[in-house]
């Protein structure tokens, strides 16, 4: 069975891992980095992903960041003169990760386990699956990020029984999960979170502070300047990271804008104390889901054995202190917070292929599911933190006499009124026979699969007529749209491959021209004119093809030049070897002569 890669598709950074033997290994990207910025930019028709895209974010307005925050919505982003769905942009990131994983493995990759925040709703999970499909990946499993982290942490501890709390604060989302580990079973007891809290929010607090201070000093609002804003974002992210290691950092942004008197610069010192003050409310928000998860799991703090920190934002000192204060425990630092989720996803891939044995993952649904009933009430069928996969049925009836149809309004959330919860979908069960209200028996069944994706069935028990809906993401992508996006992604991948081949060819041509010119210079006046003339002619032909920008001709002429230059190099090598041999022979003769010179004639006197 082919390898199943594990992908952590993050808000700010992503990572890909693969199982090698029994160990999960992070695959470094082409720049040698173990995580890849979740950034996509467009330039001259080319799609750029990762570090290169992030580097040009300041100067390139067609750069898209933090697309994960829009997953599961109908919101689109504009770039490159087109509109893109969040799934398409996410697919570009996935395609890039898939591409360098294939380079590393030396084989085609078609299957993946992709992680999502535990608190992602059904629409967001479906959108993630669609993104994988567009990228040419069969998504074998959607796994919650804290669960994946627990899998990576606990794989070598299957003989130990312990309860762990995973505190996962990423770039854009926050989750807390409590798991029980024992005998290879990873049982999620409860999960809670906040999909609108992450490292980006901490950056924004610094940005707002810089904008306010600059406006106070210069009377200019930098938030209205898109390029200045991107520079502020980069500076804020750097300052946040610096303050994890030092207590004060200098922010210096020369020529940030221009005033009436000329260019203006932003110079500011940010202390850790000020940063803690700015982000106090964000840190406080992390405490609520911790308490919620403990309450839902029915556990006290003393029953938690380990606290695992996941996500780059858990490096913020105030966050670490809050975790210590809230749990009364020193966090376990045995896992890399940036890499552990992708590693856990790869382990789940190994469970699916059978390479990892005796491991069972029991995850839960993060939010309650139900339907709207009379009076706009939200009636729950499946409570949050129910182990998945699961199925639940309940019988309802009509609200009016002779009602011919019922509307099934499917919702996800915790609020008592339907209007306050998230709509997952609507469908209708028709042709209900005329009867007084309360008589027809309508059975509604909810099914949640192992990926947390929901399907709902309504059945008239009198007529046996039924209607089923698989909840689609809010983006409303049809199968046809996904197929079109897949074809576009394949075409882009082919175009990228051709573009890379073209760049490689041009580099090879430049290298060959430089090397041949050097060799011709070195062989001047050393004989073998025939070989030199042939190499010079081939060099001139290649230069002409380069000038004409004819790629096919360049390829052919490059092969010809390499052949002629090699023949010349062989001659040069032979001459050098002969000269070396002659020199060695001469040296030997000289040594022999010197030995003769050292002989002293002795005098012999006979007595």
UniProtKB/Swiss-Prot annotation:
Transmembrane segments: none
Ranges annotated as biased composition (Acidic residues): 595-607
Gene Ontology MF annotations: ATP binding; ATP-dependent protein folding chaperone; unfolded protein binding
Keywords: ATP-binding, Chaperone, Nucleotide-binding, Phosphoprotein, Stress response
CDD domains referenced in this protein's UniProt entry, alphabetically: ASKHA_NBD_HSP70_DnaK-like
Residue ranges with Low complexity bias: 581-594
Modified residues (Phosphothreonine): 173
Conditions for induction: By stress conditions e.g. heat shock.
Pfam families on file: HSP70
Start and end residues of each stretch annotated as Disordered: 581-607
InterPro entries, A to Z: ATPase_NBD, Chaperone_DnaK, Heat_shock_70_CS, HSP70_C_sf, HSP70_peptide-bd_sf, Hsp_70_fam
Listed PROSITE patterns: HSP70_1 (PS00297), HSP70_2 (PS00329), HSP70_3 (PS01036)
The family this protein is said to belong to: Belongs to the heat shock protein 70 family.
NCBIfam families: PRK00290.1, prok_dnaK
Record function comment: Acts as a chaperone.
Protein name per the record: Chaperone protein DnaK
């Amino acid at each position: 069975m082919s390898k199943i890669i594990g992908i952590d598709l993050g808000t700010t950074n992503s990572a890909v891992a693969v199982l090698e033997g029994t160990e999960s290994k992070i695959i470094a990207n082409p720049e040698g980095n173990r995580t890849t910025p979740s950034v996509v930019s467009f330039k001259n028709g080319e799609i750029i992903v990762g570090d290169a895209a992030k580097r040009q974010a300041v100067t390139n307005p067609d750069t898209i960041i933090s697309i994960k925050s829009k997953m599961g919505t109908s919101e689109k982003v504009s770039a490159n003169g087109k509109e893109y769905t969040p799934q398409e942009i996410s697919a570009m990131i996935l395609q890039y990760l898939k591409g360098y994983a294939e380079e590393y493995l030396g084989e085609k990759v078609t299957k993946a386990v992709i992680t999502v925040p535990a608190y992602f709703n059904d629409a967001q999970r479906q959108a993630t699956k669609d993104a994988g499909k567009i990228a040419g990946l069969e998504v074998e499993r959607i796994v919650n990020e804290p669960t994946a982290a627990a899998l990576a942490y606990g794989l070598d501890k299957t003989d130990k029984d312990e309860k762990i709390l995973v505190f996962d604060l990423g770039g854009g989302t926050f989750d807390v999960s409590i798991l029980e580990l024992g005998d290879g079973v990873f049982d999620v007891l409860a999960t809670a979170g906040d999909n609108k809290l992450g490292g980006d929010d901490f950056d924004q607090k610094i940005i707002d502070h810089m904008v306010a201070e600059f406006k106070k000093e210069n009377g200019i609002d930098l938030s209205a300047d898109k390029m200045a804003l991107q520079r502020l974002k980069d500076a804020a992210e750097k300052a946040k990271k610096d303050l994890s290691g030092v207590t004060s950092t200098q922010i210096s942004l020369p020529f940030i804008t221009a005033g009436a008197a000329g260019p203006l610069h932003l110079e500011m010192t940010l202390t850790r104390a000020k940063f803690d003050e700015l982000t106090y409310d964000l840190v406080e928000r992390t405490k609520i889901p911790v308490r919620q998860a403990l309450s839902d799991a029915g556990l006290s703090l003393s029953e938690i054995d380990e606290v695992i920190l996941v996500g780059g934002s858990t490096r913020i000192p105030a966050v670490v202190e809050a975790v210590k204060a809230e749990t009364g425990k020193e966090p376990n630092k045995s896992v890399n917070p940036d890499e552990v989720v992708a590693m856990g996803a790869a382990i789940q891939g190994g469970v699916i292929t059978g390479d990892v044995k005796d491991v069972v993952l029991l995850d839960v649904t993060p939010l309650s599911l139900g339907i709207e009933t009379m009076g706009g009430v939200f009636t729950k069928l499946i409570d949050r933190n129910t182990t998945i996969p699961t199925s639940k049925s309940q019988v309802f009836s009509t609200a009016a006499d002779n009602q011919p149809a019922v509307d099934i309004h499917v919702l996800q959330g915790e609020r008592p009124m339907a209007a306050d919860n998230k709509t997952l979908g609507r469908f209708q069960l028709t042709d209900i026979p005329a009867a007084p209200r309360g008589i027809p028996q309508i059975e509604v069944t909810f099914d949640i699969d192992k990926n947390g994706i929901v399907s709902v069935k309504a059945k008239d028990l009198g007529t046996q007529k039924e209607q089923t809906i698989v909840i689609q993401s809010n983006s409303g992508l049809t199968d046809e749209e996904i197929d079109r996006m897949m074809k576009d992604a394949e075409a882009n991948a082919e175009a990228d491959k051709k573009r890379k081949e073209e760049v490689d060819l041009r580099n090879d041509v430049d290298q060959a021209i430089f090397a041949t010119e050097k060799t011709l210079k070195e062989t001047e006046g050393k004989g073998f004119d025939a070989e030199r003339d042939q190499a010079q002619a081939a060099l001139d032909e290649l230069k002409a093809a380069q000038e004409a920008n004819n790629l096919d001709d360049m390829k052919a002429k490059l092969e010809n030049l390499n052949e002629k230059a090699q023949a010349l190099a062989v001659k040069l090598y032979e001459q050098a070897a002969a000269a070396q041999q002659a020199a060695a022979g001469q040296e030997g003769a000289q040594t022999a002569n010197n030995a003769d010179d050292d002989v002293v004639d002795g005098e012999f006197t006979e007595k």
